[in-house]
Amino acid sequence: WIMGHMVNAIYQIDEFVNLGANSIETDVSFDDNANPEYTYHGIPCDCGRSCLKWENYNDFLKGLRSATTPGNSKYQSKLILVVFDLKTGSLYDNQASEAGKKLAKNLLKHYWNNGNNGGRAYIVLSIPDLNHYPLIKGFTDTLKQEGHPELLEKVGYDFSGNDAVGDVAKAYKKAGVSGHVWQSDGITNCLLRGLTRVKEAVANRDSGNGYINKVYYWTVDKRATTRDALDAGVDGVMTNYPDVIADVMNEAAYKNKVRLATYEDSPWVTFKK
């Protein structure tokens, strides 16, 4: 999965997919009442990027739905996975469940079109704080209450705070999650970060009894870093330059080892070599 980083304006969806991304990451900010409000990152953000692009969250969802609904004039068949980077740092811990409920209602209405031929992309809810694990239950309970438990087949989870792998496992246990787990590891492109924790996450994924299904590394903009990440066995790389990742994947060392994921590749099933 080549994951386009910080895709917060609707026009950027096409821009990143046309550069080679089959997945995008979108920031979601919340208002004081835990309503998802804008697709917005703000300052500071990655080096070389504008931090200030934004849409109203519901408008972005409608644009995303168009891009991921077969038959729509804006349809992009390659776009199969969307990571919502939930900026829950602005919320009190006791608002996490409420944020999950509201997120579920927004997605159900504006993205899934109330279960009637909505967008088809898989969704990952990425949460920066382990203490906000109740967001997951708020989300899953709401989809069930609204009569659409089947949509949970399209939803996965990520804790993005670079916490110890054992602590992340405990948070999932509390949230009642087993399966559909992506594990991110990374840092802004302005700084360097080694692959120690990525390798630990990959080992958990491949152990047969770990909690992780897929591992992605962010933010990868350089060819050398891309090679290191691919060598470490990641499933996804998040990048500001999808074309760079695509180029590396076409190099002799990689073109017979890795390929771009398609809609038929489940993002929840651990790939067995």
From Swiss-Prot:
One Gene Ontology biological process: lipid catabolic process
Domain of life per record: Eukaryota
Co-factor(s): Mg(2+)
Keywords: Cytolysis, Dermonecrotic toxin, Disulfide bond, Hemolysis, Lipid degradation, Lipid metabolism, Lyase, Magnesium, Metal-binding, Secreted, Toxin
Compartments in which it is found: Secreted
Documented EC number(s): 4.6.1.-
Residues given in the record as Mg(2+) binding sites: 25, 27, 85
Predominant place of localization: secreted
Cofactor detail note: Binds 1 Mg(2+) ion per subunit.
Keyword Plastid part of the UniProt annotation: no
Tissue specificity as recorded in UniProt: Expressed by the venom gland.
Listed SUPFAM superfamilies: PLC-like phosphodiesterases (SSF51695)
Active-site residues, Swiss-Prot/TrEMBL: 5, 41
Disulfide bonds: 45-51, 47-190
Catalytic activity: an N-(acyl)-sphingosylphosphocholine = an N-(acyl)-sphingosyl-1,3-cyclic phosphate + choline; an N-(acyl)-sphingosylphosphoethanolamine = an N-(acyl)-sphingosyl-1,3-cyclic phosphate + ethanolamine; a 1-acyl-sn-glycero-3-phosphocholine = a 1-acyl-sn-glycero-2,3-cyclic phosphate + choline; a 1-acyl-sn-glycero-3-phosphoethanolamine = a 1-acyl-sn-glycero-2,3-cyclic phosphate + ethanolamine
Coiled-coil residues: none
Any single Gene Ontology cellular-component annotation: extracellular region
GO MF assignments: lyase activity; metal ion binding; phosphoric diester hydrolase activity; toxin activity
Function: Dermonecrotic toxins cleave the phosphodiester linkage between the phosphate and headgroup of certain phospholipids (sphingolipid and lysolipid substrates), forming an alcohol (often choline) and a cyclic phosphate. This toxin acts on sphingomyelin (SM). It may also act on ceramide phosphoethanolamine (CPE), lysophosphatidylcholine (LPC) and lysophosphatidylethanolamine (LPE), but not on lysophosphatidylserine (LPS), and lysophosphatidylglycerol (LPG). It acts by transphosphatidylation, releasing exclusively cyclic phosphate products as second products.
Family according to the record: Belongs to the arthropod phospholipase D family. Class II subfamily.
Protein name: Dermonecrotic toxin LhSicTox-alphaIA2ai
Organism field: Loxosceles hirsuta (Recluse spider)
Highest classification ranks of the organism: Eukaryota, Metazoa, Ecdysozoa, Arthropoda, Chelicerata
